[in-house]
A protein has these predicted regions:
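Acidic, His/Gly-enriched loop-helix segments that form or flank divalent-metal centers
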Residues: 1-82, 86-92, 99-107
Length: 107
């Protein structure tokens, strides 16, 4: 299973209606090619800086960090969106985001 997981992409870049997105489990990074095996363990930067500034020219959509209130969170620049609403916890819920419309859906 570990071999299979290491073969998965770290992030996915896509463009919808002229807007560029990066999708990842916990944190996105610049779209340069990652060469280090260590990247899979540690990423490439400071998480707080990522939350504040994001990745230039992209909107990053991630999970992993449950925002306060179990709602989809956006940074002040609007280029980082955290969708983890704690659905694995008793007080959590599943948060979904429609990229085309920006609609937030909670289950």
């Amino acid at each position: 299973m570990a071999k299979w997981m290491l073969e998965l992409p770290l992030q996915i870049a896509l463009e919808v209606d002229g807007t560029k997105y990066l999708l990842a489990h916990a944190m996105t990074s610049s779209t340069y090619e990652v060469c280090s095996d260590e990247y899979y363990l540690r990423g490439d930067g400071d998480f707080q800086s990522f939350l504040n500034h994001g990745i230039e020219e992209y909107i990053s959509i991630c999970g992993h960090s449950n925002p306060e209130g179990n709602v989809i969170w956006r940074n002040y620049k609007g280029n980082v969106i955290i969708c983890d609403c704690g659905c694995g916890f008793q007080s959590g819920r599943l948060g979904c985001l429609c990229i085309e419309t920006g609609e937030e859906i909670y289950v």
